[in-house]
Amino acid sequence: ITFLLISNLCFSQLKSVIINSETKEKIPYVNIWVENENIGTTSNEKGEFTLEINSTKTILFSAIGFETKKISSDLINNILELKPIVTELDEIVISKKLSQKLIIGKFKKSKINNYFGCGIKPWITARFFKYTEEYERTPFLEKIRILTKSDVKNSKFNIRLYGVNEKGEPENYIYNENIIGIAKKGKKITEIDVSKLDIEFPEKGFFIAIEWLIIENNKYEYKYTMEGSRKKLEGISYEPAIGTVPAETDENSWTFNQGKWKKIWKNNGGSFKRYKDKYSLLAIELTLTN
């Protein structure tokens, strides 16, 4: 009992509401990480978050349309402000004719049996789409189709669209607002219509990133047993899982956790045969149009 009391005293809980420094509006779905540690969470729809830490830490806050903020935990008060990014958008002349379409990244739902999933810590995984001259006639993004598998109804995930830096990493948003996908229960193809957002395929290519949201609506509790044991353990996941396709190299697949971008890992021998010793790439299909 003494040990438990001492342990509890060592932990402190950060609790705050994240707002826009200019408009004072609350910011939902902010990705929050303890720098260089596997501790993190997501702000809810009201911009609220709680986070338990055992000492003074450096906390990273990342949200679409805002500058990433790095701050010491002992400086976080009841209200935390993020500064919006000012983006100068080029004038876009949009044609009324939407006669041409091109689909890239096609996948077969029936062949996918490997997924990225999320436990109790938030993370982001991204897929790079390279630009080719073929896309010149259909430069606008119309639809995003993603293979999802959810154990709860209407789980939400966030889509971030990034450019690419000199190191090949995701950097700088090409669209400065959240794009929320909603996955129905079961194995489904989730389609997001972005035709009204006027997103043009950058000539340097771009990343589509999936961000898991640590919110109550996505929480799934289950029981499982370890190999060689009959004892039932309790587990928590945050839905949905996102389907992947196998790739020969890691060049187009990145992950973001602990506040840093890293290349995807190689699948081990325990993976399905089709994925064994390959790299997992998000199963994403894009419809391009003029």
Name every feature range the model reports, one short phrase each.
Residues 88-164, 211-290:
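Beta-sheet-rich sandwich/jelly-roll-like modules and their strand-loop junctions
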Residues 14, 22-36:
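Short, ordered, surface-exposed loop/turn motifs in non-cytosolic proteins
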Residues 1-17, 290:
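Bacterial Sec-dependent N-terminal signal peptides
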Residues 156-230:
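Aromatic- and Gly/Pro-enriched, solvent-exposed loop/edge beta-strand patches characteristic
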Residues 34, 60-71:
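A short, solvent-exposed loop/turn motif at the edges and junctions
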Residues 38-48:
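Short, acidic Ser/Thr/Gly-rich low-complexity loop/linker segments typical of extracellular
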Residues 14-21, 47, 80:
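A short, amphipathic beta-strand motif
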Residues 75-96, 192:
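Extracellular beta-sheet/turn segments enriched in Thr/Pro/Gly and aliphatic residues
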